[in-house]
Amino acid sequence: MVEFEDQLVFNSISARALKAYFTAKINEMVDELVTRKCPQKKKSQAKKPEVRIPVDLVKSSFVKKFGLCNYGGILISLINSLVENNFFTKNGKLDDTGKKELVLTDVEKRILNTVDKSSPLYIDISDVKVLAARLKRSATQFNFNGHTYHLENDKIEDLINQLVKDESIQLDEKSSIKDSMYVIPDELIDVLKTRSFRSPQVKDNIISSTRLYDYFTRVTKRDESSIYVILKDPRIASILSLETVEMGAFMYTKHSMLTNAISSEVDRYSEKFQESFYEDIAEFVEENERVDVSRVVECLTVPNITISSNAE
């Protein structure tokens, strides 16, 4: 009996010691996790309702092909799905129908005729969103309160003045201190959102002339999305191990491949580029330009001369 009681005491002491040991270890692990720079999770945001694109702003042959004429508006996700499921092979490469019916630049067509379909440079399903976006065009005008307004990049001031003259928007003299402030009604906001796929930045239906000008500048800016980009120097391809194709005096690679290669050089904890990468690109990218992936992409490439084909 005594031996049994001693065993109980021994087991009790061992349990307390074991608990203390594990508690200390767990505390050490927690401290290490707290002090380590872990990438912060982005706060989940409420999903915004998807904008419907007016049928008249979608490529007419595409609308007819898929019987979308009677739609009140076409979701971009539907366009993406139709492009992916009808213009690509089972291997995920752009098929011959897609080459004829989707909007491609002349350079893109030349590259497709040069590289093999098995090449990573060939257009594939990773390019669906770019191809789908090209099927919609920017609005050139909108109607409001019986007036027709034209959207032209070099005549934005005239547009704003005309909106004021027609009383479609009103100058708010009380709020106009450093900048002219305008009252913009909900009905006009809805029209602009429908025709340009984005809303002006307003607060309590008030918007400054600067923000309104910037808004019209953005919605009238031509879409410059590219599948292929021109590298500034052939050495960039070697540094990033990129597949390339030469067209005349220019060396092209896929925009997505270049972006992925640069993104892989970002440290997941510090969210900064690796030091070795800084050294490799120092000749092409100034130190103050190394702010993010998209900026580095701009510094390593030459602006494309876009000549569209199959557009309407």
Swiss-Prot record:
What the record says about the induction of its expression is:
Expressed in the late phase of the viral replicative cycle.
Query: One Gene Ontology cellular component annotation?
Result: virion component
Key words of the record: DNA-binding, Virion
- A GO molecular function held by the record: DNA binding
UniProt-annotated location(s): Virion
Pfam families under this entry? Pox_I1
Note, other: Each virion contains approximately 670 molecules of OPG077.
Of which family is this protein a member?
A: Belongs to the orthopoxvirus OPG077 family.
| Function, as annotated | DNA-binding protein which binds to the hairpin form of the viral telomeric sequence. Required for the production of mature virions (MV).
UniProt protein name: Telomere-binding protein OPG077
Native source species = Variola virus (isolate Human/India/Ind3/1967) (VARV)
